[in-house]
């Protein structure tokens, strides 16, 4: 099986010569061209569709409003800045979210950059909070996060955005009319990471995950084009919770090193686990029971998310199905390793990730061919 665990190279984005600030990925920009070992679902023409362009939703064409398209156009950021911002978000996704990034490769070209943008927003905020290599105090990180958030909401109100990440996020939010309240909730939860190191109960943890995970699902919905957005909200939120709880279980050791425990303290007490037990190289029987309990809880969230897949546009379903398998497979791997969470990060094998991708590729290509893209020209394009 071709190794697809690390997504094939996408080396940049370039403006389209015909439709304003379109996105294109070199190596994928000629008709019929694909990257090694990875066919592009339904790809037939040059370049990626520009931000603000959508394909038809279930049953009929659907595009962002003209007002949204105008707001998201060149007035928000120049073409060079915009394409560079989308490329930066793609790089963040590829570098830090390999399973998620692999699943996004099953989306149609025109949807993918917007998903990268939303991932980039979340990842960049996370890097501010975790202070990766900057040596800032918690107070300085709080100020940096507040400043970044204020600039983001300011850009949404108008003006030219030159931020290397936010230009793409602002463009995506305007193009699809994504609820700004979701971003406020997310930033509130990110700020909690600067002061809160543990959660007493699962309800307390859910209060944090509401902003850090559930709203990520609802942010994505407009891009994924559900037939019934209202019905799709609950499953989308459940999927966000499932993904994050999976990460919390897998990353127990990494979080401990940062002084955080995301597993509810009430659960530790229930199974007779002390925080220090989570740092033992060899998990105790009590730790194994605790982690098995948390895995079962995560699986319940995955089950609650499943009905939402069929509500999405057909071209979005293969991506989400693959993501469900990729993240759910981490729980399988944790169980197979007898909950050895401190001996390196638990990952699916390259062969298994490749097999999951290949299993959904045909459906992705078929759906992309059926959904004819509708071009929304931006003013001045």
Where in this protein do the model-derived segments appear?
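Catalytic cores of Mg2+-dependent Asp-rich isoprenoid enzymes
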Residues: 2-15, 68-243, 249, 253-381
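Long, intrinsically disordered low-complexity tandem-repeat segments
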Residues: 21-61
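Alpha-helical and His/Cys-centered functional microenvironments
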Residues: 37, 64, 248
């Amino acid at each position: 099986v071709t190794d697809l665990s690390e997504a094939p190279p996408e080396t940049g984005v370039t403006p389209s010569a015909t439709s304003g600030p379109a996105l294109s990925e070199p190596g994928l920009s000629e008709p019929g061209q694909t990257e090694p070992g990875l066919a592009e679902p339904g790809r037939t023409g040059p370049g990626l569709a520009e931000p603000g362009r959508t394909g038809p939703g279930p049953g009929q064409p659907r595009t962002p409003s003209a007002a949204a398209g105008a707001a998201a156009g060149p007035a928000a950021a120049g073409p060079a800045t915009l394409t560079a911002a989308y490329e930066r978000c793609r790089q963040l996704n590829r570098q830090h979210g390999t399973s998620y990034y692999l699943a996004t490769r099953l989306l149609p070209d025109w949807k993918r950059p917007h998903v990268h943008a939303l991932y980039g927003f979340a990842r960049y905020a996370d890097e501010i909070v975790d202070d990766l290599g900057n040596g800032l105090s918690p107070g300085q990180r709080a100020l940096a996060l507040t400043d970044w958030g204020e600039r983001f909401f300011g850009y949404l109100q108008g003006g030219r955005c030159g931020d290397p990440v936010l230009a793409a996020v602002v463009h995506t939010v305007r193009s699809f009319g994504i609820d700004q309240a979701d971003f406020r909730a997310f930033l509130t939860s990110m700020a909690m990471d600067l002061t809160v190191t543990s959660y007493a109960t699962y309800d307390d943890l859910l209060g944090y995950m509401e902003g850090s995970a559930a709203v990520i699902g609802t942010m994505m919905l407009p891009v994924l084009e559900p037939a019934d957005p209202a019905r799709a909200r609950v499953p989308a939120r459940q999927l966000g919770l499932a993904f994050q709880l999976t990460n919390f279980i897998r990353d127990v050791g990494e979080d401990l090193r940062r002084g955080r425990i995301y597993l509810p303290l009430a659960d530790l007490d229930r199974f007779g686990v002390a925080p220090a037990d989570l740092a033992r190289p060899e998990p105790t029987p009590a730790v194994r029971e605790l982690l098995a309990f948390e895995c079962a809880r995560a699986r319940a969230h995955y089950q609650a998310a499943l009905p939402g897949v069929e509500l999405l546009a057909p071209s979005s379903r293969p991506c989400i199905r693959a993501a469900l398998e990729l993240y759910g497979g981490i729980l399988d791997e944790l169980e197979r390793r007898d909950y050895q969470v401190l001996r390196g990060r638990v990952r699916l094998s390259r062969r298994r990730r490749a097999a999951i991708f290949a299993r959904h590729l045909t459906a992705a290509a078929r759906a992309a061919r059926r959904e004819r893209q509708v071009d929304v020209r931006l003013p001045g394009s």
